[in-house]
Amino acid sequence: MDFNQVKVINHPLIQHKLTIMRKKETSTVKFRTLMHEVSMLLAYEVTRDLEIEYEEIETPLATMQSPVLKGKKLVFVSILRAGNGLLDGMLQLVPTARIGHIGLYRDPKTLEAVEYYFKLPEHTQDRDVIVVDPMLATGNSAIAAVKEVKALHPKSIKFLCLLASPEGISNFHGEHPDVPIFTAAIDEQLNDHGYIVPGLGDAGDRLYGTKLAH
């Protein structure tokens, strides 16, 4: 597996919070709060290379050239439904970002992604896009979502997740070798049901309290 396009964000705060999220006894409320906090920390890293330019401003004491973000506003694209759990924290850091949603569910028999919703901001072309989903398991949902985004000709695309599997990374970069993956951890493997092991269960279920995590 080629890890040149994979960035593991091994920050102590992220790893500590992720450990609590993994615990089966962590409540829905606590899980949701931690997801918000971790997403802010991940967003800080994934936006590290945004372009800047300089504008002249006046401080109370002097005039100076000071850096500001260059170009059009970012676009965050959430893969529904669990991707929404990452958005609030990211928007707190980048409140001017545009938001898109791609609805995909995984067929339980084939594990393939099935699309049911697609809505992205106008003029996504020439913008930097960050596609978000907490789990990169089989990679099928991420592959399908990024394919849709690419059709709109953005300036750049990155994929951000909490956890990734080796299989998911391999599958994703088999289809999109040009798209970097940012993740908090790479776990051991997938089980027969396509869940990341040891993982944290089903991120959507744990976010919204819809059923017990696997």
UniProtKB/Swiss-Prot annotation:
The reaction(s) this protein catalyses: UMP + diphosphate = 5-phospho-alpha-D-ribose 1-diphosphate + uracil
Co-factor binding details: Binds 1 Mg(2+) ion per subunit. The magnesium is bound as Mg-PRPP.
SUPFAM superfamilies the UniProt entry points to: PRTase-like (SSF53271)
NCBIfam families on file: PRK00129.1, upp
Family membership: Belongs to the UPRTase family.
Amino-acid positions noted as binding 5-phospho-alpha-D-ribose 1-diphosphate in the UniProt annotation, renumbered to this chain: R81, R106, D133, P134, M135, L136, A137, T138, G139, N140, S141, D202
Protein name (record): Uracil phosphoribosyltransferase
EC numbers for this chain: 2.4.2.9
GO MF entries: GTP binding; magnesium ion binding; uracil phosphoribosyltransferase activity
GO biological process: UMP salvage; uracil salvage
Binding site for uracil: I196, G201, D202, A203
Pathway the protein acts in: Pyrimidine metabolism; UMP biosynthesis via salvage pathway; UMP from uracil: step 1/1
Organism: Legionella pneumophila subsp. pneumophila (strain Philadelphia 1 / ATCC 33152 / DSM 7513)
Regulation (activators, inhibitors): Allosterically activated by GTP.
Disulfide bonds: none
Keywords: Allosteric enzyme, Glycosyltransferase, GTP-binding, Magnesium, Nucleotide-binding, Transferase
InterPro entries from the UniProt entry: PRibTrfase_dom, PRTase-like, Upp_B, UPRTase/APRTase, Ura_phspho_trans
Protein purpose: Catalyzes the conversion of uracil and 5-phospho-alpha-D-ribose 1-diphosphate (PRPP) to UMP and diphosphate.
Essential cofactor(s): Mg(2+)
